[in-house]
Amino acid sequence: MSFLARRRHKKLAAMPGVRAVRRPVTPDSGERFDLHYVRTGPAGGAPLVIIPGGPGMASISAYQGIRKRAAAGGHGVIMVEHRGVGMSRCVDSGADLPPEALTIAAVVDDIAAVLDDAGVDTADIYGASYGTYLAAGLGVRHPNRVRTMVLDSPLLNRDDFEVVRSEARALLWHDDTDLAAKMRGLTGAGVLVPEDLTVAAVVYGIGGPDLL
């Protein structure tokens, strides 16, 4: 982890409601890492667990506005920084989590572990796009933790996820359109890096080409 990344990590960790729970790197490993999550709003009752699209986009920093609006409406919210992403990307040494640690089953079990750490028996689960895959997985592996569930733009299997990724790449990079040409131009000029395409796809999904 670089100096700048470490400094940003410490800043986010100091935000109200941010906590870390120790999780195994792999089921058979004795090594553990800090999985971060944030809980905001009223503490009583069943919170809303929001699982946004992705994968690869952090939750703690990017969705502060949504959590503030939810808190203003009297809703408690939990969002997990999933393993391999953002504040939950590294093992204690600062190295990235190994590929074998990044499985759907592990991510789903992480969500249940967060509910344990937060003292929550059941929660209302909201998943969007890729987040619906994780939400459904939680319902399968830990059905007793789910009070209600909303699946927004659901992915039903891994093939659906590949279709979405392929369409996003075509739309934002490969197509002969003004939007794709701008994305290629900004990347070539060093304004964007390839990883920014993940964020661009999320922005496009929310507000279309005008917002992007």
Enumerate the predicted regions with their spans.
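Conserved hydrolase catalytic core segment
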Residues: 121-160
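Conserved acidic catalytic loop of the alpha/beta-hydrolase fold
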Residues: 105-123
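A catalytic-pocket lid/entrance helix-loop region that shapes and gates access to the active site
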Residues: 144-188
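A structural signal for the main folded, soluble domain(s) of proteins
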Residues: 16, 33, 131, 138, ...
